Amino acid sequence: LRYFWTEHATALYMLHAAVYCLYIIYCLYRSEFFCFSLAAVFAGFSFYFYSKGLGMNARTAIIAIVTALVLAAVALLANRAAKSKGSVKLFGKTVKVFPAKFNATVLYVACTVLGCCLVACLVLGSALFAYYCMFAAIAIELTGAVYYTFQLK
């Protein structure tokens, strides 16, 4: 029991820090940066678990599917909101998700790069490549943090 608890304690600590950072981003920044960060966090965690040597098993496949769904949902949300000035129709009601003048291209690029890294990890099957993709997700997040910090007024 002690071995398995300490093996996944690092992931729990990282998850706690990620949720806390996402909450701060949700409270302080624009909503598009929250979606950007959500995609980067999901992709980063999937790269982390894949780099820990899980290989291609059921757990890795589920993590990859969930990450692909999150990336697709963020890209679709950005697409729908860009067409209607930041608003999206949900269950017949119009909900303002993003500001009227938001840059959907940043979300598209982030989702595309993270999705390509995910596909490359699954195709190549290398834990070392997934480890480097984890740092790519961190770099994308830091780039987004700088970009959206300069967008604050």
Mark where each language-model region is.
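Hydrophobic alpha-helical transmembrane segments and adjacent interfacial helices
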Residues: 1-4, 17-28, 40-56, 108-125, ...
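Structural signature of hydrophobic alpha-helical transmembrane segments
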Residues: 2-17, 64
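Membrane-helix interface "capping/anchor" motifs
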Residues: 24-39, 150-153
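Central hydrophobic cores of alpha-helical transmembrane segments
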Residues: 33-46, 134-137
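Detector for outer-membrane/organellar transmembrane beta-barrel domains
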Residues: 42, 59, 66-70
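Membrane-helix boundary/juxtamembrane motif in polytopic membrane proteins
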Residues: 55-65, 82-109
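Alpha-helical transmembrane segments of helical membrane proteins, especially in multi-pass transport
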Residues: 73-84
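C-terminal transmembrane-bundle signature of multipass membrane proteins
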Residues: 76-77, 94-153
